[in-house]
């Protein structure tokens, strides 16, 4: 006996881009039959004429990790057809939590009513599974989180001991369930990671069996092409798959550059580098407001940045710099 027949749906099967109209039969939790089921009996029959049926969507770039605990129903995604979600993007992840990384994550989690009761990925996912979640979920390990764990938000090159500690956290995180690594190279503290640090962490991920690197590029605007080259070179040098997150050419003066960046990705693929990009279908983005500040304004960490902004003389000087450096961009920024 078929449990459920979905009748007359327009089906996108995820393989052939051309949809087809037919019936689908479900037994238990499995799709058992696809075809004309008009003569078959079922416990339930859903009239899907005029509706579209597809496999669950994979949201490969999300920032709702803590919400898996705050509200396991995840209706905001389920109602969009998302059934699998990947967290830990843009260099920020729910683990590993050490030092400043633990303190900051506790603040972020508290904002959605979640109390930190884990330090590593296996502990986090055990809590998620125990509480229940409507989605299939997985996570990358963020290199902003690992760097923050060993050096806080301080700028500068990691010394050898700090770098080895960060690589150890990458390896341990993958052993405890992370799918790979991510970076957010416009954000503190990821923006301070140099080629040496990124290469070491990517190599650690590869050696741990998860050679995947997703990156929010160092620039998505004026320096987009150099930033794309940086990511593709890392893929080549570390022998890891590269995912360019929410790929775009930001700012109207840069829009045409996306053709050249896509050409760069195609050339890299032709050379044997595993490189892909994802994008969203609108000309807007959300991010932290402090990313518009000059880089040196963020030196010393968040408290040092806030102290500068509280100082009237320094705040005026920063405002003048922003007027000069972003004179043609203010009409595009909404708060």
Stretches found by the model and what they are:
Residues 1-40:
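N-terminal metal-binding scaffold of metallo-dependent hydrolase/deaminase domains
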Residues 9, 29, 50, 61, ...:
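Divalent metal-coordination and catalytic microenvironments
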Residues 38-39, 204-212, 233-242, 267-274:
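Secondary-structure transition/capping motifs at alpha-helix termini
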Residues 74-114:
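Hydrophobic or amphipathic alpha-helical targeting/insertion segments
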Residues 90-97, 110-237:
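Hydrophobic, small-residue-rich alpha-helical packing segments that form membrane-like cores
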Residues 103-116, 295-305:
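Acidic, Ser/Thr-rich peripheral helices and adjacent loops at domain boundaries
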Residues 128, 134-160, 166-187, 241, ...:
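Active-site neighborhoods of metal-dependent hydrolases
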């Amino acid at each position: 006996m078929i449990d459920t027949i979905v009748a007359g749906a327009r089906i996108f099967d995820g393989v052939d881009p051309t949809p087809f109209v037919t019936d689908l039969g479900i037994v238990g939790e499995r799709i058992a039959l696809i075809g004309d089921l008009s003569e078959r009996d079922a416990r339930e029959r859903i009239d899907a004429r005029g509706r579209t049926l597809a496999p669950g969507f994979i949201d490969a770039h999300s920032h709702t990790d803590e919400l898996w605990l705050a509200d396991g129903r995840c209706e905001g995604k389920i109602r969009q057809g998302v059934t699998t979600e990947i967290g830990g993007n843009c260099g920020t992840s729910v683990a590993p939590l050490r030092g400043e990384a633990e303190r900051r994550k506790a603040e972020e989690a508290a904002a959605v009513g979640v109390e930190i009761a884990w330090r590593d990925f296996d502990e986090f996912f055990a809590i998620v599974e125990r509480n229940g979640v409507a989605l299939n979920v997985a996570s990358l390990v963020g290199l902003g989180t690992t760097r923050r764990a060993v050096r806080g938000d301080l700028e500068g090159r990691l010394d050898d001991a700090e770098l080895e500690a960060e690589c150890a956290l990458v390896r341990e995180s993958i052993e405890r369930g992370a799918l790979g690594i991510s970076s957010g190279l416009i954000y503190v503290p990821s923006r301070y990671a140099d080629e040496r640090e990124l290469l070491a962490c990517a190599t650690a991920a590869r050696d741990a069996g998860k050679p995947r690197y997703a990156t929010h590029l160092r620039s998505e605007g004026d320096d987009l092409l150099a930033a794309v080259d940086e990511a593709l070179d890392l893929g080549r040098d570390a022998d890891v798959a590269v995912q360019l997150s929410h790929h775009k050419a930001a700012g109207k003066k840069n829009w045409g550059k996306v053709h050249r960046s896509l050409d760069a990705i195609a050339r890299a693929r032709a050379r044997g580098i595993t490189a892909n990009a994802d994008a969203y279908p609108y000309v807007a983005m959300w991010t932290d407001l402090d990313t518009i500040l000059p880089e040196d304004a963020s030196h010393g960490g968040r408290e040092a940045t806030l102290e500068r902004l509280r100082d009237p003389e320094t705040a005026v000087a920063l405002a003048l710099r922003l007027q000069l450096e972003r004179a043609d961009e203010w009409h595009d920024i909404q708060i």
